[in-house]
Amino acid sequence: MKVRSLLFGMLCMLALGVSLASCSDDDDDSLDDGGSKVTLPQTRVYILNEGSKGANNAGLAFYAPNKDADFISDIYKTQNNAKLGDLGQSMIEYEDEIYIAVYGSNYLTKLNAAGVELKRVSFVGDNDLSAGIRYIDAEDGYIYASFWGGAVAKINATTLEVVDKLTGLGDNLEGVAICEDMLYVSNSCTADYTYHNDVKVIDLRTFTLKETLTVASNPNTQMLEEDDKVFLISDDYSSAEGYVLQMIEPAKGNKVTKIGNATYMAANNDILYLVNSMTDWSTKPVTTVNTFFTYNIKTGQMNNASFLKDAPAELVSSTLHMLTINDNDGDIYISTSDFITNGTIYRFKKDGTFIEKFDAGGVNPNSAVFFN
């Protein structure tokens, strides 16, 4: 009887241990919502509304794709009792935290998964970085940021301390992407809009400039990494077919190849999703035609068939401001803007089926991050 009792007790303790371990694992999977004033579902989308220059009206909208919470037009203001600032330029998610570069106000902020501000760093008083933060990427515990004025900063992702800077890289630095321990940075133009045609390659292991690549004129904001390659759009105003889409291949000595024309791009599962917006400025009012298509990175084949199904008719002729994809489920998000009133977000399934459209909550929605 004592043996049976002992065995029973051991089994109970084992079961309790498994139960406690399971609960602990669940807790580890949860997001950091510390300090939140609202209850949020685990699946959530944040949309950065850039705002208008000088209007101090940048904002961060919250959207629940599973319809288990109400839309919040500016969750940053809700959570922090403050405005985000002037011109929200770019946003990334890194290690379940949100980083936003606010260009006009010239600072970088770190938020938890509920939009509560954890830290911020201002660059206003730094002579090397005072021209304004632009685009950001992250790797191995650091945020890398481009700045107008020709600088790149290496920032500790935890403390937001600037641990290193590279200056004299060019003029108005824009889009950034990390591939194979290298940071690729677009050198767009001078302050008076004399356009450059180069991309800077920085070795992140030493944080030194490795080389300068020649690309089409005015490499700009659109740059990303997919399948160990870097894709870049140059806003070449001399190109009659539209802005120039290029591929940089690190495995081939950073070979640069033009692969088409596009205005916006996003990537998922080795497919590049593209839109080419052609505007006729001679008409009153101006007219725009948007063409949606894809590029298979593995095969190198362009597919001119639209990746959208039953899209609202107005999307073909609207002014676009964002194309992004939720890596978790493949849903496609496209924004439109008139640069004055609130933008509109169009959401599609991975297969291109239209789901819905909704008010973006602010002016010029330019990026989104996803938590699932």
Positions of the model-derived regions?
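Repeated scaffold domains used in trafficking and secretory/extracellular systems
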Residues: 34-35, 83-92, 128-138, 171-180, ...
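Short loop/turn segments that connect beta-strands within beta-propeller blades
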Residues: 65-67, 112-116, 156-160, 203-207, ...
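Short coil/turn segments that connect the beta-strands within blades of beta-propeller domains
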Residues: 41-45, 95-96, 140-141, 180-181, ...
